[in-house]
Each structure stands twice: as C-alpha cells, then as structure tokens.
C-alpha cells in the first residue's frame, strides 16, 4: 500500500446482495473519507431522475370524456384506474412508442395480462390489477399509449396538443424504473487506515431493469458527464495574435515632445522635420548642413534621442504612415 498523502484509493464492488429479482443491496469500498456521500448522492440523483424507462402517457376509455367520472359496472373510479395504469411496468422492444389495447367483460379483475400487444412489448407484472368489473354485463375497452423517456414529465406539458380528441386522457409520466433507493455510509478499514468510507446502496426497481444493471448504467452516465472536465487538458486555447503597431508610437510623436532648445527646434521645423520619425532618419552629416544648426545642437539632439533608445540614421520602412500624410 502506498503512503502518499495525495494518492487516492480506488474502490471496488465488494458485494451485490440480491434480496429479490428487483431488490438488491450494493456495497462499494474502500472510499476516501467523504467520497461515500459524494458518490452516493450523485448516483442516487441519477437513478431517480435520469434513467430511461417506459410509462403510460395517454389513455382512452370508451364512454369516458374526462378523468373526474366513473364507469358503470367498474368498482374503481377513473382516477383510480389512471393511477393503476401509471404503475404498469413494461418494456417496448425496438421502438419508442406503442399503442396497446384492452377489452374485458364480465365479473372479475382486469389485470395487465389482459392487455393486447404484439411480441415487441413485455409486461413485467402481468398480475398487476387495473380495475374490477362488478356485473355480468359490465365491460371496459381501453387504448393505452406507452412511450419511452426519462425523468418526470407532467401531463400539463402536453396539454397544448391541438389535435387531441375529447376523451383522450393525459397522464403524468414517471419514466424512471427505480421505485425506491437509499444509501448509507459506514466506516471502512484498509490495513492501518480507519478513516475510510463504505458505501451501501439499496434499491428496488419496477422489474424493467435489475438493480445491478441500473447501478452500472447510472455510473456510466455519471462518468460520461465528467468526461468533459477530463478533456479540459486537451483543449488548446486559440492563440490570439496581438497586432503590433506598424510603427513605434514614439516615432509618431511631434519633435516638440523632445523639448529641445528653441534654436534646435526652429532649425528642424525649417527643414520640415515635424515628427520624431522624420528626425531619426536623418544622418549627422545631413543635420549639420541645416542652416544655423551647429555641433552643439547636434549633440543635444543625439542625447535626447538616446534617452528614448533612438539614434540618428535609422531606417524606417513605409515611412511616413498614412495617418501623418492625412494630417498634413
């Protein structure tokens, strides 16, 4: 075992206790302190809100115009029937939407096994009771729309459908196949370390997925969402090339900024030397030919230019700039 303070322990799936086909306890350890709650809460939220599944979204019952009514010969009112339909656990194979039908007559229970479907639909709990018929001549005829989705989608979000016929009842769709989930964090020990976590997740599903597959899918979803952060190291910020000015700003300043003596300044202006860029391109010989500009003035000019890291006789390409020509 490494003793590095910065090295994280990697957990392993210790045990899957299968209490029933749809109920299991999953134990993960060892985890660094605090990671039990971090992972437990993240997985719990994903399992409850982000797992794909199937749900009844629309129902049509012959003779029924709205959910706040009852049907003669049926023990339950329509609201109860809709609640029972919401608890249907089924799987659609190869497609995302299926329309099923149900017809039953005579006294007795109406169960999920009475639903008429093709081989692409699997009903996980065929014994699930939908309603009870109380008279010999009573009957019920339903069309049931099932859709694939994830999370919770309220019926009100689909109320805007304009071509929805009267009598088509919309149901809140809870797509999650997870019925109950909780987690607990206990103390764990590895060799001499006793400050570790053990994560125990207990869950029940509706039978459309087993608990082990559910936890693996939730972990995959979490991992895929975090990949974007892992890939941050591979993202290269585009290099922003700073546009360098074509000319040193100092060269664009007027010679008056050099604060030369009046004599030297007047001599330069007489030679149409208005900018520092004009001045530095002149040589010493050229300046000495300027009327009234002697060696003393030349020395002054050279000293002032040197304080700005400039010299006489410099070559400046594309001088003068367009901006100076326009101003002139």
UniProtKB/Swiss-Prot annotation:
Reaction(s) catalysed by this chain's protein: RNA(n) + a ribonucleoside 5'-triphosphate = RNA(n+1) + diphosphate
Coiled-coil residue windows: none
Top enzyme category: transferase
GO MF, one annotated term: DNA binding
Stretch list, region Alpha C-terminal domain (alpha-CTD): 247-328
Transcription in keyword set: yes
GO biological process annotation, one example: DNA-templated transcription
A cellular-component GO term for this protein: cytoplasm
General function of this protein: DNA-dependent RNA polymerase catalyzes the transcription of DNA into RNA using the four ribonucleoside triphosphates as substrates.
UniProt domain comment: The N-terminal domain is essential for RNAP assembly and basal transcription, whereas the C-terminal domain is involved in interaction with transcriptional regulators and with upstream promoter elements.
Similarity annotation: Belongs to the RNA polymerase alpha chain family.
Subunit (UniProt): Homodimer. The RNAP catalytic core consists of 2 alpha, 1 beta, 1 beta' and 1 omega subunit. When a sigma factor is associated with the core the holoenzyme is formed, which can initiate transcription.
Protein name (Swiss-Prot/TrEMBL): DNA-directed RNA polymerase subunit alpha
Protein's organism: Wigglesworthia glossinidia brevipalpis
């Amino acid at each position: 075992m490494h003793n590095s303070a910065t090295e994280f322990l990697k957990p392993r799936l210790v045990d899957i206790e299968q209490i029933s086909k749809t109920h299991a306890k999953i134990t993960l350890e060892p985890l660094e302190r605090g990671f039990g709650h971090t992972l437990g809460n993240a997985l719990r939220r994903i399992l409850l809100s982000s797992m794909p599944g199937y749900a009844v979204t629309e129902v049509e019952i012959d003779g029924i115009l709205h959910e706040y009514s009852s049907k003669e010969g049926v023990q339950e009112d329509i609201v109860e029937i809709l609640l029972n339909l919401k608890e249907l656990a089924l799987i659609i194979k190869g497609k995302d939407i299926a329309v099923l039908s149900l017809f039953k007559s005579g006294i007795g229970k109406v169960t999920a096994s009475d639903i008429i479907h093709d081989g692409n639909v699997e009903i996980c709990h065929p014994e699930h009771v939908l309603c009870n018929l109380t008279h010999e001549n009573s009957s019920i005829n339903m069309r049931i729309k099932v859709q694939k989705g994830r999370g919770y989608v309220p019926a009100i979000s689909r109320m805007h459908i304009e071509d929805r016929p009267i009598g088509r009842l919309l149901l809140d769709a809870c797509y999650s196949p997870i019925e109950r989930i909780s987690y607990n964090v206990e103390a764990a020990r590895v060799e001499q370390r006793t400050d570790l976590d053990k994560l125990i997740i207990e869950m029940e599903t509706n039978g459309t997925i087993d608990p082990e597959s559910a936890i693996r899918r939730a972990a995959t979803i979490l991992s895929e969402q975090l990949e974007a952060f892992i890939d941050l190291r591979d993202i290269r910020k585009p290099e922003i090339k700073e546009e360098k000015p074509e000319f040193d700003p100092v060269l664009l300043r007027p010679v008056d900024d050099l604060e030369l003596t009046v004599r030297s300044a007047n001599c330069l202006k007489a030679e149409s030397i208005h900018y520092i860029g004009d001045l530095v391109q002149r040589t010493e010989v050229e300046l000495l030919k300027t009327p009234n500009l002697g060696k003393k003035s030349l020395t002054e000019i050279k000293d002032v230019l040197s304080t700005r890291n400039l010299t006489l006789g410099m070559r400046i390409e594309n001088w003068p700039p367009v901006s100076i020509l326009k101003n002139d």
